[in-house]
UniProtKB/Swiss-Prot annotation:
Family recorded in the similarity comment: Belongs to the neurotoxin 10 (Hwtx-1) family.
Record's keyword terms, sorted: Amidation, Calcium channel impairing toxin, Disulfide bond, Ion channel impairing toxin, Secreted, Toxin, Voltage-gated calcium channel impairing toxin
Its job: Allosteric modulator of voltage-gated calcium channels. Moderately inhibits human Cav3.1/CACNA1G (IC(50)=5.06 uM) and Cav3.3/CACNA1I (IC(50)=4.32 uM), and weakly inhibits Cav2.2/CACNA1H (IC(50)>25 uM). Acts by making a crucial interaction with a Leu residue in the extracellular S3-S4 loop of domain 1.
Disulfide bonds: C3-C18, C10-C23, C17-C30
MF (Gene Ontology): calcium channel regulator activity; ion channel inhibitor activity; toxin activity
Annotated Pfam families: Toxin_12
Tissues showing expression: Expressed by the venom gland.
Location in or out of the cell: Secreted
GO CC annotations, alphabetized: extracellular region
Descriptive protein name: Omega-theraphotoxin-Avsp1a
Phylogenetic classification of the source organism: Eukaryota, Metazoa, Ecdysozoa, Arthropoda, Chelicerata
C-alpha cells in the first residue's frame, strides 16, 4: 500500500509515510500540522 501525501495511514511519529507531514495518532493518518 502506497502512502499518500495526506490521509496516508501511519502508526505514530516519526513515520516515513508522512514525510514532512505529521502523524495524527488520534485518527491514524498523516495530516498537516494545523489539523493535528
Amino acid at each position: 500500500g502506497d502512502c499518500h501525501k495526506f490521509l496516508g495511514w501511519c502508526r505514530g511519529e516519526p513515520d516515513p509515510c508522512c514525510e514532512h507531514l505529521s502523524c495524527s495518532r488520534k485518527h491514524g493518518w498523516c495530516v498537516w500540522d494545523w489539523t493535528v
